[in-house]
A protein has these predicted regions:
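Bacterial N-terminal signal peptides
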Residues: 15-26
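Conserved catalytic/binding loops enriched for acidic/polar residues
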Residues: 457, 461-467, 471-475, 483, ...
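The catalytic-center signature of Zn2+-dependent metalloproteases
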Residues: 317, 327-355, 584-591, 596-640
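Auxiliary tRNA-acceptor-end handling modules of aminoacyl-tRNA synthetases
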Residues: 33-296, 314, 318, 329-514, ...
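Bacterial N-terminal signal peptides that target proteins for export
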Residues: 2-17
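Sec/Tat signal peptide C-region and signal peptidase I cleavage site
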Residues: 28-32
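Zn2+-dependent metallopeptidase catalytic core
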Residues: 80, 299-323
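Soluble non-cytosolic domains of exported or imported proteins
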Residues: 261, 294, 298-306, 580-585, ...
Length: 1011
């Protein structure tokens, strides 16, 4: 009898709810009655049929009118409250056409006769009691992106909207500033396809957005609509852990009160399940299936497949066989050609012929759970065909590698320290200086992490990592970094393998020496006797003749074999490169991008697993991978003389870290997760990712190599020397333009800069580990790089950047370093480049960059702070030692004996060294006069810089007094002017630091350079 009583109790509330519902329905009907009829609105339109023959109903209905490219769509009747994906692609008219350009999670919400497109708040949630949920909902509201009018109510009861007005008129809202419809009158409906789970719509537009040359460019923009699936499909999210690198889906749960519980992070991964859970090794219920687009060259497809298949081995370790399946589109047979690469139901590997070295593996992720729903891989051919090294583009990037936001802020106010300015062509220097000064005023000094635009992927270093709940691979530079290595290979394949040739010559000489020694021993053991000696001499003569004939025959055989080998090699070239060389490089790159689609982030510590000798050894070659992961930017392993054999040029499989990461992300044994993570201290499982590359850890770097990078850097410099010796006679062939000599030299200068920049990161460095308390070994999370390693790195930078001989310049080479004079854009900036190479500007650009690496405030602060991290009785590289070492290297001529026979053609201090010295002096002045209080280290830095300047003036005085009469005019004038500027600057500096208002007077006294 109690139930009816309760029913009576709640009857008034129920009646009120029903009444409200009826009133809402009536109001909706009234609004619908005010709208035009659907028949009138859809007049002249034809419905787009569902493309799937096995289904009769699409995600929503679409009608098109071909004559004027009009498109209308009817949303589902039950659209309210549902989340939808809108995935974006610029599918033509762009160098990165086909690259997934980001996505939006949206809701439609009706307001009278208009529909608002809403970006729901997904970042802040409450999973606890009803009160906390209500509070969060009230405080953290959704965002209105745009609104459109309702044209009519459709035949299925849903609102009808103007799709072309939405997608063309608001293109910038979706794609960001890179897409702006500059002429709305010129557009065309490219395609409209309706599927059961998605709708695909593409328009040709005139784009006048950012980075578009001229008033407009025809492009195709593609929209993919799909419903965000429910969370009731059996997928179980997995917590992220900073010791293993996965992209994450993150939100704040404000119903929790512990710090560790408030921020919820799930790894992004696929929903893989065993078909038969009883089997230790079972096929998946639904594999990850990739389709290779028909545009991928047939000659490369087996290597694409190899890169994908690498990962199946890792999934077998967790009990899934054939977790990833690969299929091929084929235009000739029509196989899979009905599948649209933009269709979100299919995962595609796409190939772009855009002459740009890049690759990317973005994915679409459930915003609540981190489940990966679909993914694509875009490969380009530019890195393979890359032969034209662009000095102005790549050199500054190499020089800026590892710079932090702190350093960028400093460079913005000190442009003479900025490698991007110093390496710029003279005609662009002022523009670059102003540009970077503006960037320095932005958050984090214009650091890419702060400026990444989530609306469009592929144009910023940290794309995909910020701006949305779920991270994804928004930009990958693995292929771009490999472009420089391939450019070396394309200098001349014979040059690339010259190290093997040199090793072969050395081995031949060693064998000959051994044979000579054996012959001497044999002669000594002969019996005495004139007759026997005569017989032996005659026999030896005959033998010598026979040997000469044999040598001639052997030489001919070797020549024939070389010719046969060359012919055989030519038969297996892929676009001018041996298949055995470039094929594994492509497989390595594909494996890297597949790793991203599986949820894995970069691991920039992976290349530091083995020493260079271990990598180039028979024990490792073909048996183990050269790095612990394919998720690093590992350079091509060009050997000169390290180890006992040329090791693998690239990764030949996924590495031990990759197996471990897949085990953590995809194992079915949740109880094993802590045990899996506890292995994080093992050498092959070390991890650092994108945001770590600007920190103090020298092993967390892109493009470095080996456990002992100093050995790698020295090896690179040997290759540089070898290449430079062969530029004129080997690289530039008969009939070639002499512009190749310049390009060849600038390639070597790029490699030299890369090696020096890599080693500069070790100065002031500290190894950083992601261990947690209780992990094996009890390592401290921060461990200062041993002082001896820092000193060795410092010496390498000095030797490779400060001295003339490091650059290998000769009059014969310089007079042939011309330029190709074409105005058609065939070579970058060639029409504006002088035929005479700007020797001093180019070399000073590298020298100035080296000084910036070693003397920028961030590096000096790290050295200063490291002194306190170590016990006083432990060896450390100190700030005074660093500055004194640089000073001694830059001004070494002052300590030498007075020169004999010097004149203006043979100066005591060369022109390149005078430039370096003037630059160094100015850097010390900048540090002395710096008044910023950004860091507590500025004062001791300033004091020590002042002391170095005082020491320098004393050394200059002593040198002028001792050797002044024997100095050439260049050197004497240089030293005299340097001393005068230091004295005046230090005197003015006291006034400047006492009252900054005196700065104009200081500038007047010091001249333009002091600004």
């Amino acid at each position: 009898m109690k139930a009816p009583v309760l029913g009576m109790k709640y009857l008034p509330r129920l009646s009120a709810a029903v009444l409200a519902l009826v009133s809402f329905a009536a109001a909706t009907s009234a609004r619908a009655a005010d709208l035009p009829s659907f028949d009138k609105v859809s007049e002249g339109y034809e419905q787009v049929e569902v493309s799937d023959q096995q289904a009769t109903k699409g995600l929503f209905n679409v009608w098109k009118r071909d004559k004027d490219s009009q498109l209308i769509g009817e949303l589902p009747k039950n659209f309210a409250g549902k989340n939808y994906f809108i995935a974006l692609t610029v599918s033509s008219g762009d160098l990165y056409a086909g690259l997934q350009s980001g996505d939006w999670v949206v809701q439609w919400r009706r307001y009278d006769d208009r529909l608002a497109l809403i970006a729901p708040n997904l970042r802040t949630r409450a999973t606890g009691d009803a009160e906390s949920k209500a509070s969060v909902k009230r405080l953290f509201t959704d965002t209105v992106m745009l609104d459109v009018p309702i044209l009519a109510m459709g035949p299925n009861g849903g609102p009808v909207i103007d799709m072309d007005a939405l997608l063309i008129g608001h293109a910038t809202k979706f794609f960001g500033p890179s897409v702006r419809v500059s002429n709305p009158r010129i557009n065309e409906l490219k395609s409209a396809k309706v599927f059961p789970e998605n709708v695909e719509i593409a328009f040709d537009i005139v784009n006048g957005g950012r980075n578009i040359d001229g008033s407009g460019k025809l492009q195709t923009i593609h929209y993919s609509f799909s419903e965000v699936p429910s969370t009731s499909g059996g997928y179980k999210p997995r917590d992220a852990d900073e010791r293993v690198g996965y992209f994450t889906t993150t939100y704040s749960d404000l119903s929790q009160y512990k710090d560790d519980d408030t921020q919820v992070r799930y790894i992004n991964r696929w929903h893989l399940e065993k078909r038969d859970s009883k089997l230790s090794l079972s096929p998946p219920k639904e594999p990850i299936r990739f389709y290779v687009e028909h545009t991928a060259p047939v000659r490369y497809r087996r290597w694409i497949k190899a890169g994908v298949d690498y990962w199946n081995k890792a999934f077998e370790k967790v009990g899934i066989v054939d977790a990833i399946v690969i299929e091929y589109q084929d235009a000739q047979s029509g196989v899979h050609m009905e599948k649209d690469p933009e269709d979100v139901r299919y995962n595609f590997i796409r190939w772009l012929n855009n002459n740009i070295g890049t690759a990317i593996g973005p994915s679409r992720v459930h915003p609540e759970t981190g489940e990966i729903l679909d993914a694509d891989i875009v490969l380009t051919d530019g890195w393979i065909r890359h032969f034209n090294f662009n000095y102005e583009d790549l050199m500054p990037k190499l020089a800026m590698e590892g710079f932090s936001a702190e350093t960028l802020s400093w460079l913005g106010t000190h442009p003479t320290w900025d490698p991007r300015v110093r390496m710029a062509p003279a005609e662009q220097a002022n523009f670059r200086r102003a540009e970077y000064a503006r960037q320095a005023q932005q958050p984090m000094g214009g650091f890419a992490m702060a400026g990444a635009d989530p609306a469009l992927l592929g144009d910023d270093e940290y794309d995909g990592l910020f701006g949305s709940v779920s991270q994804k691979n928004g930009l990958c530079m693995a292929a771009s970094g490999r472009s420089l290595d391939l450019a070396f290979a394309r200098m001349d394949w014979g040059l690339t393998l010259m190290a093997d040739e040199e090793a072969a010559k050395k081995k031949k000489k060693d064998d000959e020496d051994k044979a000579d020694k054996d012959g001497e021993k044999a002669d000594a053991s002969k019996k005495d006797g004139d007759a026997e000696e005569d017989d032996a001499e005659e026999a030896d003569k005959d033998d010598d003749l026979d040997d000469e004939d044999a040598d001639d025959k052997d030489a001919k055989k070797v020549g024939d074999k070389d010719a046969d080998d060359e012919k055989k090699e030519d038969e297996h070239l892929l676009d001018g490169m041996p298949e055995w060389f470039v094929g594994p490089l492509l497989a390595d790159l594909v494996a890297h991008e597949v790793g991203h689609t599986l949820g894995l982030r970069h691991n920039f510590k992976a290349s530091s697993l083995y020493t260079l000798d271990e990598i180039n050894s028979e024990a490792l070659k073909g048996k183990k991978t050269i790095a612990s992961s394919v998720m690093d930017y590992t350079p091509i392993n060009y050997r000169y003389d390290s180890g006992n054999a040329q090791g693998d040029y690239a990764m030949i499989d996924i590495g031990p870290y990759d197996f471990w990461a897949i085990e953590y992300g995809y194992t079915f044994k949740d109880k094993e997760l802590p045990k899996i993570l506890s292995r994080c201290t093992e050498p092959e499982l070390q991890y650092a990712t994108d945001e770590d590359t600007t920190g103090p850890d020298p092993l967390a770097r892109r493009y470095d190599f080996a456990k002992d990078p100093l050995a790698y850097a020295n090896e690179q410099m040997k290759l540089v020397k070898l290449y430079r010796e062969r530029i004129l006679d080997k690289f530039v062939k008969e009939g070639d333009t002499w512009g190749k000599a310049r390009r060849g030299y600038e390639l070597t200068l790029g490699l030299q800069t890369k090696a020096s920049s890599m080693m500069a990161n070790w100065v002031g460095g500290a190894f950083v580990y992601r261990d947690k308390k209780g992990d094996p070994g009890d390592r401290p999370p921060v461990e200062v790089v041993p002082a001896d390693q820092q000193r060795a790195a410092l010496k390498f930078v000095i030797d490779s950047a400060f001295f003339d001989e490091a650059y290998g310049l000769t009059p014969k080479l310089l007079e042939r370093m011309s330029v190709d004079k074409w105005i058609d854009g065939g070579f970058h900036s060639s029409m504006s480049s002088e035929a005479t190479w700007p020797i001093h500007d180019r070399i000073l650009g590298v020298q100035a960059s080296a000084l910036t690496w070693l003397m920028n405030p961030t590096t000096l602060r790290r050295v200063y702070d490291n002194e306190l991290r170590l016990p006083e009785d432990e060896d450390a590289l100190t700030l005074p030692e660093l500055l004194a070492t640089i000073n001694a290297a830059v001004w070494g001529e002052l300590k030498k004996e007075c020169p004999e026979g010097r004149n203006d053609r043979k100066p005591m201090i060369s022109s390149l060294r005078r430039n370096l010295q003037r630059e160094h002096m100015q850097r010390l002045l900048d540090l002395v006069l710096e008044s910023s209080d950004d860091t507590a280290a500025y004062k001791p830095i300033s004091n020590l810089a002042r002391m170095e300047l005082r020491t320098l003036t004393e050394d200059i005085d002593a040198s002028l007094e001792k050797c002044g009469d024997k100095m050439d005019a260049y050197t004497k004038a240089h030293l005299s002017e340097t001393k005068e500027r230091i004295d005046r600057a230090l005197e003015a500096g006291y006034t400047y630091n006492a009252a900054s208002a005196q700065q104009p007077m200081m500038m007047f006294m010091l001249g333009k350079e002091a600004k």
